[in-house]
Regions:
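P-loop NTP-binding core
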Residues: 1-169
């Protein structure tokens, strides 16, 4: 399984759209794909015409198994949706032991070929979990000063994650 994180410290640069587009392409090529919304805005669900739901909250805070919280979009494409309850996920992770690896641990035995993480444009414990779980980080951006600054910030954070021993592919 490969894990891709879509990250930028700047909002509105195309993280969600990029994640949805890649997930669509992978699933159409029969690659079993899971999208996980780590953003409290819950835009991944909206991208598929679904209502926001507390899938991530149920997975992390209520310890429900992954297969109970996924929504199947179509064959080879599943979603763990997010909503405002994602803020509670951040608090739960903050109180946990080994908090930086919670997402990695939850995904360890996931039955997918690819997992795509849509990260919020913030730097918090959930964002860090996404970066640590990722094999690859995709940084969508626009050609403007604020978006480029967001790229610099995420690259700095990734370097810090690598200093702790994590290696991106």
């Amino acid at each position: 399984m490969k894990v891709f994180a879509f990250a930028n410290q700047k909002g509105g640069v195309g993280k969600t759209t990029s994640a949805v587009t890649l997930a669509d392409g992978l699933s159409r090529h029969k690659i079993k794909t899971l999208l996980i919304d780590l953003d409290p805005q819950g835009h991944l669900a909206l991208s598929f015409g679904l209502n926001k739901s507390p899938g991530l909250y149920r997975l992390v805070c209520l310890d429900e198994p992954l297969e109970k919280v996924v929504v199947t979009i179509r064959p080879n494409l599943d979603l763990v949706a997010g909503d405002k309850q994602t803020e509670k996920v951040k608090r739960q992770i903050t109180l946990s032991d080994f908090r930086e690896n919670i997402l990695s641990d939850l995904l360890a035995d996931a039955p997918y070929d690819a997992v795509l993480l849509d990260l919020a444009p913030s730097l918090d414990v959930l964002h860090l979990n996404g970066l640590i779980a990722a094999d690859w980080v995709i940084i969508p951006t626009r050609p403007d000063a604020l978006a480029v600054d967001g790229v610099k910030e995420i690259l700095t954070t990734m370097a810090e994650v690598e200093q702790s021993g994590h290696r991106y592919q």
